[in-house]
Regions:
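N-terminal glycine-/serine-/threonine-rich phosphate-binding loop
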Residues: 1-43
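Short beta-strand segments
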Residues: 5-9, 44-48, 95, 124-127
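Short, active-site-adjacent cap segments at secondary-structure transitions
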Residues: 12-14, 50-55, 101-102, 131, ...
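Active-site glycine- and acidic-residue-rich loops that bind
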Residues: 21-27, 104, 129-136
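Alpha-helix C-terminal capping segments
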Residues: 37, 79-89, 141-149
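Loop/turn-to-beta-strand initiation segments
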Residues: 40-44, 119-122
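Ligand-binding beta-strand-loop-alpha-helix segment within the catalytic cores
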Residues: 58-122, 137
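Internal active-site segments that recognize and position negatively charged phosphoryl groups
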Residues: 110-158
Length: 158
């Protein structure tokens, strides 16, 4: 079974709107991913949070707090996009490296691999769960833990 990890930047989710979500763009992404799923590909997705928050540009907020806000922005993105995917006919599950109540599942390698094997599109939100790391770092870390291929030249943000 082939597995892939996709990184969707927050800016990509915002489309022409530049902030928030562009529903038409997100539906378009869902249709493309559905083709992969229908072809038997196991899909995991990491999102950025730049459509809601760019902490590195803040001059007044502590860097740790700014990064935590960014992590939560990725959670919002994954919850939203996962629901768009459900609307498009896919099963999904959102994982985070920290407890997020009833909204997400706490990440474990076994649970993530099980969800992939069940045919679910798996979303990894919250980055590494630690400040000072980009969502790309979180994507690479989670990919390694979940036996997902990682391009050694970097992760392409779409």
């Amino acid at each position: 079974m082939k597995r892939v990890l996709l990184k969707l930047s927050g800016e990509a989710l915002a489309g022409e709107k530049k902030t928030g979500f562009d529903e038409a763009t997100c539906i378009g992404v869902a249709k493309q991913v559905k083709q992969l799923v229908d072809d038997g590909v196991q899909v995991a997705i990491v999102t950025g949070g730049g459509n809601f928050w760019r902490g590195r540009t803040s001059e007044t907020i502590d860097r740790t707090k700014a990064d935590q806000i960014g992590m939560l922005a990725t959670v919002m993105n994954c919850i939203y996009v996962s629901d768009i995917f459900r609307f498009a006919g896919m099963e999904t599950e959102v994982f985070t490296p920290f407890v997020c109540g009833a909204f997400t599942t706490l990440f474990s390698k076994d649970k993530a691999v099980e969800a992939l094997n069940q045919g679910k599109v798996v979303f990894f939100a919250g980055g590494t769960g630690h400040p000072y790391f980009s969502t790309d770092t979180g994507a690479a870390e989670t990919a390694g833990a979940s036996s997902l291929p990682v391009n050694t030249t970097g992760i392409k943000s779409a």
